[in-house]
């Protein structure tokens, strides 16, 4: 493994452990030419999100959407940043304008469900969440603790008691 690839792999590992400063150190040691790589941008984005630096993260996610318009990841992250900045209606719109490949991701349906719940659109929320749970049953466990779904908690539990 070349040094840049080793550093990128190390940075990914640090992000997974929540060690954002260490991940940034690995990325900082990369040659300048590597900073434009999609995987490096994604790791930087995850660091910003982990540090709750939502505006910077959104700007980087939007850049990723422009660079990789067919890839769903940038759209999911950008919408999440908007939601965290209390711009949930914009988050819904952003995801709605994303590529068709988004609709293959359970995270798309889960996040749409959360955003609709936050806006009080409970029936729409439940429909999106049900689709997410069909695609990835583990999301049901996550939903039990998700504060965005507090208003729907009893209905979600009743559906699968």
Each PLM stretch: what is its role?
Residues 16-17, 50, 84, 118, ...:
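Register position in tetratricopeptide repeats
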Residues 117-141:
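TPR/TPR-like (Sel1-like) alpha-helical repeat modules
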Residues 39-107:
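Alpha-helical adaptor scaffolds
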Residues 9, 43, 77, 111, ...:
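"A position-specific structural signal for the A-helix of alpha-solenoid helical repeats
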Residues 134-161:
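Terminal, low-structured helical/coil segments at or just beyond the last alpha-helical repeat
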Residues 3-33, 42-50:
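Alpha-helical segment of the N-proximal tetratricopeptide repeat
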Residues 31-32, 65-66, 99-100, 133, ...:
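A conserved position within tetratricopeptide repeats
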